[in-house]
A protein has these predicted regions:
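Short, small-residue-biased leader/transition segments that mark boundaries at the very start
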Residues: 2-4
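Transmembrane helix-loop junctions in multi-pass membrane proteins
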Residues: 8-13, 22, 94-107, 129-142, ...
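Extracellular loop-to-transmembrane helix junctions
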Residues: 18-57, 238-244, 345-358
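Membrane-interface alpha-helices at helix entry/exit sites of multi-pass transporters
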Residues: 21-30, 66-69, 74-85, 222-238, ...
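Helix-loop-helix module between adjacent transmembrane segments
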Residues: 31-59, 68-104, 108-132, 286-297, ...
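Selective recognition of specific alpha-helical transmembrane segments in multi-pass small-molecule
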Residues: 34-42, 121-136, 147-167, 200-203, ...
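Extracellular/periplasmic helix-exit of transmembrane alpha-helices
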Residues: 42-50, 54, 159-175, 189, ...
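Membrane-interface loop-to-helix entry segments
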Residues: 83, 91, 104-110, 116-164, ...
Length: 379
């Protein structure tokens, strides 16, 4: 969570500005303020209610598990809880959508950079992803080296752009706030679009409240539940106010007439081309290609605990959901841009609703854990 090895730091911000204009950035910032506390609560609860994973070792958990405790605790023989099942199913829908967003973005960026038809890029992407699934350890070692290097390069390039164009920052900030609250935008419905897209893409990027991050938080080997919650809350701030803001700035510092009418990765690559020429277009394509694999691994990990909740601890279900993810990856590469985002949005929205059903009644448990953590550090 606390890194830029994630699809949302690029794709989410680009989609927000494409659909909601500069004003969407303000609403992403606001959502992050609310999301930090939500991230703390859900990650802490994931640690409190985690359980042993007999199939892979370690621990597993997430909203499906604390929803089960909340609604099925009176009947210990009850195998399922309705809301837990609904969350797990909506999570699978969401991660199918995210798989499609990944391949769609990579295919689009490769078409811009190398003029390769989306179908060919998609086939290659799915083939590499299949190797990751089958020979995970060897591939992950390569990703662990390459992805941080590319992420650091991207971060320093964005900082370089921002520093070089520091004189334009007041105008960009003015544009962000004016498009978030301006009279012209209010009359034309632009504020509504900015709020909606800023909120949706902010949630897509930092994941706070959607219930996906707790699936990873539950597996963390940490000495106190509240400690993991605090790490997740900090991650939301770093994700949104540092990484996502950098991505937003490099797009908004470009003259508007050069990016007018562009959407998706076309917009980001046009911005990078403005600063670095053809190198910028190719660099974004390559960094997206690498990020797609780390994100895909994250999707498989998130989905694993939910599949186990729905279908039990068996290798058949654990294999089938990976095959489904590969199929979704292929469909996304050749599907329409708006379709893949709509599918992901529906899944994220449903996950958030079911997750919030648990967070409100269980929040006192997380706050008790925080109090205990504070007392333990005072002693």
């Amino acid at each position: 969570q606390m890194c830029i090895r994630d699809r949302g730091n690029l794709m989410g911000v680009v989609a927000a500005i494409s659909a909601g204009g500069a004003g969407a950035v303000f609403w992403m910032w606001l959502i992050a303020l609310l999301g930090a506390s939500t991230a703390f609560i859900e990650a802490t609860l994931a640690q409190i209610y985690k359980e042993k994973d007999p199939l892979y070792g370690g621990y597993r958990g997430g909203p499906a598990y604390y929803l089960h405790v909340l609604f099925a605790s009176r009947s210990k023989r009850q195998r399922y809880s309705l809301f837990a099942c609904l969350f797990a199913l909506s999570g699978l829908l969401c991660w199918c959508g995210i798989s499609q967003v990944i391949s769609n973005s990579v295919a689009s960026s490769f078409e811009n950079a190398f003029h390769i038809p989306p179908l060919y890029t998609t086939i290659f992407l799915v083939a590499i992803a299949a190797i990751i699934v089958l020979r995970k350890n060897a591939t992950v070692k390569v990703l662990d080296i390459m992805v941080p290097i590319m992420a650091a390069c991207y971060f320093f390039l964005t900082i370089f752009i921002i520093v070089k164009n520091a004189g334009q920052l007041p105008d960009v900030l003015s544009r962000i706030f004016s498009e978030a609250f301006g009279l012209r935008q209010a009359v034309g419905g632009g504020i509504g679009a900015a709020i909606m897209n800023g909120a949706k893409r902010g949630l897509f990027s930092n994941e706070a409240g959607s219930g996906s991050a707790p699936c990873a938080a539950a597996a963390a080997d940490i000495d106190h539940p509240a400690k993991e919650g605090l790490f997740q809350a900090l991650g939301v701030f770093i994700d949104t106010y540092v990484i996502c803001t950098c991505t937003a700035m490099i797009m908004l510092l470009v003259p508007q007439e050069l990016t007018e009418g562009l959407a998706g990765m076309d917009l980001l690559q046009a911005a990078m081309a403005y600063y670095f020429g053809e190198f910028g277009v190719v660099f974004i394509a390559l960094i997206l290609f690498l990020f797609s694999f780390s994100t895909f691994l994250g999707i498989l990990f998130y989905a694993r605990s939910n599949v186990a909740y729905l279908f039990g601890d068996n290798w058949l279900s654990q294999t089938l959901y990976k095959v489904l993810a590969l199929v979704m990856l292929f469909i996304g590469g050749i599907a329409a841009y708006q379709f893949v985002w709509d599918l992901g949005d529906v899944g994220v929205g449903l996950m958030t609703i079911f997750n919030m059903i648990a967070l409100f009644p269980l929040a006192p448990k997380a706050l008790q854990a925080l109090t205990d953590y504070e007392h333990s550090h005072k002693r």
